[in-house]
Swiss-Prot record:
<feature type="repeat" description="LRR 2">
    <location>
        <begin position="78"/>
        <end position="99"/>
    </location>
</feature>
<keyword id="KW-0393">Immunoglobulin domain</keyword>
<feature type="domain" description="Ig-like C2-type">
    <location>
        <begin position="406"/>
        <end position="495"/>
    </location>
</feature>
<feature type="glycosylation site" description="N-linked (GlcNAc...) asparagine">
    <location>
        <position position="256"/>
    </location>
</feature>
<keyword id="KW-0732">Signal</keyword>
<dbReference type="InterPro" id="IPR013783">
    <property type="entry name" value="Ig-like_fold"/>
</dbReference>
<protein>
    <recommendedName>
        <fullName>Leucine-rich repeat and immunoglobulin-like domain-containing nogo receptor-interacting protein 3</fullName>
    </recommendedName>
</protein>
<keyword id="KW-0677">Repeat</keyword>
<feature type="glycosylation site" description="N-linked (GlcNAc...) asparagine">
    <location>
        <position position="275"/>
    </location>
</feature>
<keyword id="KW-1015">Disulfide bond</keyword>
<keyword id="KW-0433">Leucine-rich repeat</keyword>
<feature type="repeat" description="LRR 1">
    <location>
        <begin position="54"/>
        <end position="75"/>
    </location>
</feature>
<feature type="glycosylation site" description="N-linked (GlcNAc...) asparagine">
    <location>
        <position position="184"/>
    </location>
</feature>
<dbReference type="InterPro" id="IPR032675">
    <property type="entry name" value="LRR_dom_sf"/>
</dbReference>
<dbReference type="InterPro" id="IPR003598">
    <property type="entry name" value="Ig_sub2"/>
</dbReference>
<dbReference type="InterPro" id="IPR003599">
    <property type="entry name" value="Ig_sub"/>
</dbReference>
<feature type="signal peptide">
    <location>
        <begin position="1"/>
        <end position="23"/>
    </location>
</feature>
């Protein structure tokens, strides 16, 4: 008996004495120190009774609760966090969250909610986080969140959303983060987003939206972080799609864009982090990021990058991290950068790198550059295939990392005379180590490369082809072969003569005769002499006619007399002059 009493006393001493634990509901675990009640995975179908009034955190996740009714939580005025994730809640009645003035976190992820009735979140003035993801929401009605003035983070991803009304986000003056993912939205309403003046981060993931319109984000002046991920229908980022934003972080990943959105990026001078990974981008043209003077991180991993043109990263004066891993790059030249002195972390692993002089700048910095634990390795030449750049001995540098300047073979002068409409070719075969790239410069000082599209193109071997030649194509063409070791040039000339007969492109056959008159000194002198002789002949012919006509009139009297009598004038002077009539003798020639 004494032994039994002793064991009973010991058992009583071991019982919890905390006041919160004394009022703990059945099938729940309570903690007095943190004022937490944990009732997760208990197969509960309703809010349990007997929850201590001083509870701060209530965890009811992964149960079978179907509905929240008014008054279910009214006895918990000090509640700060409520977790109702992964139940089967289909209805939340207005007033269900009444008398919860201190509630800061409300989690309703993974339920069966299809609609949020007006007034459900009334009086939740302290709520800062609301998670409604993984439900069955189809539409967000006007003023669904108007009473949540303190809300900072809203999660509504993984729903069946097809429409967000214009005033759905009205009242969310303090919202800082919004996530929309795995919805059926096909467009973004600038009017609905325009109510989120204080929004700082917007995450848009797994959406079937095909285009970013110019006005999508114009009313979000405070947005600093924009994430666009898994938009398989997005093929282009319009130049004005980011207008009005002052982003510091931009991520556009797992889309179908095939080019760097350089025009849209020019307006983002405050950008410090840019992620364009996992897009089918095959080339980075020259100057693609020239206006991003504050950029510190650039990610282009897992794309289809095969070519990065010289000066592609010009303007990136503060670049610290560059991630080009898992692409198709054979090299990365130093002249690609504005300056490599600021670079701290470089990821070029997962590329078929050719270990030659173009990578010498990386090898020389292999002890100070951070490769983030992913060491790049050589794919060629065969002697060092699979060797990590970081582990190459210095003796290898003089054997494999040496360039040979390009040299153009067959330097015989090419002069081609073609008729308008003909196709012509100019050869330019160059050799060097590494293999040089060939470009041509036209008489109009335009550069023609292998990537050019038009009548003039450069074939893989360096040959220039000009289709459908025209007279304005005439002139001197310059071939420029270049690699990391230098360049070599070669000249060719083309003369295009106009065609005599030309078929117009409108479907009507018209014959145009083009006659060329070569103008030289002999032609001018002969033409002048012929003109003078013709003029003099005409003059002589006229004199001859006059002579013959005058002879045909017969003999004429050449002399004749004219008698003239002065008129009488009164006065003395007149009297003295009276002497009769005077005669004049004249001869006609």
């Amino acid at each position: 008996m004494t032994c039994w009493l002793h064991m009973l006393g010991l058992h009583l001493l071991l019982l919890p004495t905390a006041p919160l634990a004394a009022g703990c509901p059945a099938r729940c675990e309570c903690s007095a120190s943190t004022r937490t009640v944990a009732c997760g995975r208990r197969r509960l179908t309703a809010i349990p009774e007997g929850i201590p009034a001083e509870t701060r955190m209530l965890e009811l996740s992964r149960n079978r609760i179907r509905c929240l009714n008014p008054g279910d939580l009214a006895s918990l005025p000090t509640l700060e966090e409520l977790d109702l994730n992964h139940n089967v809640i289909a209805h939340v009645e207005p007033g269900a969250f009444a008398n919860l003035p201190r509630l800061r976190v409300l989690r309703l992820r993974g339920n069966q909610l299809k609609l949020i009735p007006p007034g459900v979140f009334t009086h939740l003035d302290s709520l800062t986080l609301l998670d409604l993801s993984e439900n069955k929401l189809v539409i967000l009605l006007d003023f669904s969140f108007q009473d949540l003035r303190s809300l900072q983070r809203l999660e509504v991803g993984d729903n069946d959303l097809v429409f967000i009304s214009r005033r759905a986000f009205a009242g969310l003056l303090g919202l800082a983060e919004l996530t929309l993912e795995r919805c059926n939205l096909t467009s973004l309403s600038p009017e609905s987003l325009g109510h989120l003046r204080g929004l700082g981060a917007l995450r848009l993931r797994h959406l079937a939206i095909a285009a970013l319109e110019d006005q999508n984000f114009q009313k979000l002046p405070g947005l600093s972080h924009l994430e666009i991920d898994n938009w398989p229908l997005l093929e282009e980022v319009a130049p004005g799609s980011l207008r009005g934003l002052n982003l510091t972080s931009l991520s556009i990943t797992h889309t179908n864009i095939t080019a760097v959105p350089a025009a849209a990026l020019r307006q983002q001078a405050h950008l410090t982090c840019l992620n364009l990974s996992h897009n089918p981008i095959s080339m980075v043209p020259r100057g693609s990021f020239r206006d991003l003077v504050r950029l510190r991180e650039l990610h282009l991993a897992g794309a289809l990058l095969a070519v990065i043109e010289p000066q592609a990263f010009v303007g990136l004066r503060q670049i610290r991290l560059l991630n080009l891993s898992d692409n198709l790059l054979s090299t990365l030249e130093e002249n690609t950068f504005h300056s490599v002195n600021t670079l701290e972390t470089l990821r070029v692993d997962g590329n078929p790198l050719a270990c030659d002089c173009r990578l010498l700048w990386i090898v020389q910095r292999r002890k100070t550059l951070n490769f983030d634990g992913r060491l790049p390795a050589c794919a060629t030449p065969a002697e060092v295939r699979g060797d990590a750049l970081h582990n190459l001995p210095d003796s290898v540098l003089f054997e494999y990392f040496v360039c040979r300047k390009p040299k153009i073979r067959e330097r015989r002068l090419q002069h081609v005379t073609a008729t308008e409409g003909d196709d012509v070719r100019f050869l330019c075969r160059a050799e060097g180590e590494p293999a040089p790239t060939v470009a041509w410069v036209t008489p109009q000082h335009h550069s023609v490369t292998a990537a050019s599209r038009g009548r003039a193109r450069v074939l893989p071997g360096g040959t220039l082809t000009i289709a459908d030649t025209r007279p304005q194509d005439s002139g001197t063409y310059t071939c420029v072969a270049s690699n990391a070791g230098g360049n070599d040039t070669y000249f060719a000339t083309l003369t295009v003569q106009p065609a005599a007969n030309r078929t117009q492109g409108d479907g009507h056959n018209e014959t145009q005769v083009g006659v060329r008159f070569p103008l030289d000194l002999t032609t001018i002198l002969v033409s002048t002499a012929m003109g003078c002789i013709t003029f003099l002949g005409v003059v002589l012919f006229c004199f001859l006619l006059l002579f013959v006509w005058s002879r045909g009139r017969g003999q004429h009297k050449n002399n004749f007399s004219v008698e003239y009598s002065f008129r009488k004038v009164d006065g003395p002077a007149a009297a003295a002059g009276q002497g009769g009539a005077r005669k004049f003798n004249m001869k006609m020639i």
